[in-house]
Amino acid sequence: MRWLAGFAWLVAAGALAFVAETKVSQLPPEARDTLTLIKAGGPYRYPQDGKTFHNREKVLPKRERGYYREFTVKTPGARDRGARRIVAGRGGEFYYTEDHYNTFRRIRE
């Protein structure tokens, strides 16, 4: 029973987050293009790309400031950056959101 209390504490502290997963092949083509650019180190389409993602929504696992970076996924027909992003962690993990950080899916290769 102690392990359950410890597990609950980790979840409450944000150290563990439950995020759905998706395969690269299931992403929209624009997200796959953005992922390719991230892995190549750019060039990026928007000046905000590569900036720190602060995880204020606490949807992703809690990490130190600067751990996550965000990148815009082009939204066809949008006049601005739209709501779609890929967030990259320093550990090599990638997350996709299509609703401006409300939900994420971890991208699996």
How would you label these PLM feature ranges?
Residues 1-19:
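Core subunits and conserved enzymes of cellular information-processing
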Residues 17-61:
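N-terminal secretory signal peptides
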Residues 3, 18, 22-24, 101, ...:
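Extended, aromatic/histidine-rich regions of cofactor-dependent oxidoreductases associated
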Residues 8-13, 27-30, 71:
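Generic signature of intrinsically disordered, low-complexity, basic-rich segments
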